[in-house]
């Protein structure tokens, strides 16, 4: 479909969804419609199957979760044209409607900013009138947790905390790559995985110049995880999103633009409320690390060494052809994670993990200046707060093994006195801020 036809699309709809419980394959249909006709899409999500057939109660609850997933996953296709009308397929309660509205506005805020589409930030879904049958309560709070694994330090810290606390976690991922497979193998735990197949038509449209950009993928993967947990009679989905995920990158047209919005505490609260209201789940989903800073998590990771040869937090590495290359060593994530780990490890260990020494590489100085708030705004990446970077630098400047590293010397001279003053009184190692961690799980981090 030519781009000019896409630009004339005036509505996005959700024709149908279905699931085959014999295979775990769910089909989600979407349509962009306009004066020139429609563009249809079908997404395929395959859930891992349980050993025993699910009960009627499980199937009913799963159906309610999939109704939310159908609407939320549509964000991938909506963005190809960003029409002004978002027409939902069925009535929703207040909490579910709030989630959907936020996913398509706040979740697409970076996309709207980069594509200069302010109307996306004001989008109001059209929800059919009618009542929603009340959900039957589904108590999963005492079942084994499904712990999302992304291959990075955060999910490893959560997985090991749950294991130490005797909570017997099940590792989970969507479309696991070689990094995640290696982390699962290092854990020694039996994982579950779901498969998500985006309609290839979308890639064809993107290649032809359709609108594209960042989506709230964590919201989609979180609902896939909840669906997997319900189908497999598992307990809460445990994520590893930290408190800096709630920190916006910038403000545009009066709206906060946050690359990590769907990892933030607001999105977590909206998703929990929607799942409780629409699916009856008593304890659906939370982030175990929500009250911790990235720097605090890095300190906890330093106490675990079984994953040194497999861990990566680098998004670019997932795209590298050489499976042995786990870090690109030239992106905001690599810079930040190296900076966060370095104060808590021998230099040889962190250099071994990364396959190189970023603080000896002077070409990294401009990127580090952004992380430290000296130049530009916080990068559109999943990185910690500026204050955390300054605190990490202050710790390195006090250590014999790091203080003379070329990048450390250059950055110490670049950081303004006001930032040093803030770092001196920082609370980055004090847990705090809003969270949704249930009391039995809060103890896991204190083990």
UniProtKB/Swiss-Prot annotation:
**EC number(s) for this protein?**
5.1.1.23
UniProt keywords (A-Z) are: Cell cycle, Cell division, Cell shape, Cell wall biogenesis/degradation, Isomerase, Peptidoglycan synthesis
Q: Provide the catalytic activity annotation.
A: UDP-N-acetyl-alpha-D-muramoyl-L-alanyl-L-glutamate + ATP + H2O = UDP-N-acetyl-alpha-D-muramoyl-L-alanyl-D-glutamate + AMP + diphosphate + H(+)
**Main EC class the enzyme belongs to:** isomerase
- List GO molecular-function terms, semicolon-separated: racemase and epimerase activity, acting on amino acids and derivatives
Q: Does the keyword Isomerase apply?
A: yes
Instruction: Give the pathway listed in the UniProt entry for this protein.
Output: Cell wall biogenesis; peptidoglycan biosynthesis
Organism domain of life:
Bacteria
Question: What family does this chain come from, according to its entry?
Answer: Belongs to the MurL family.
Q: Quote the protein name from its UniProt record.
A: UDP-N-acetyl-alpha-D-muramoyl-L-alanyl-L-glutamate epimerase
Give the source species.
Micromonospora sp. (strain ATCC 39149 / NRRL 15099 / SCC 1413)
Q: Which gene encodes it?
A: murL
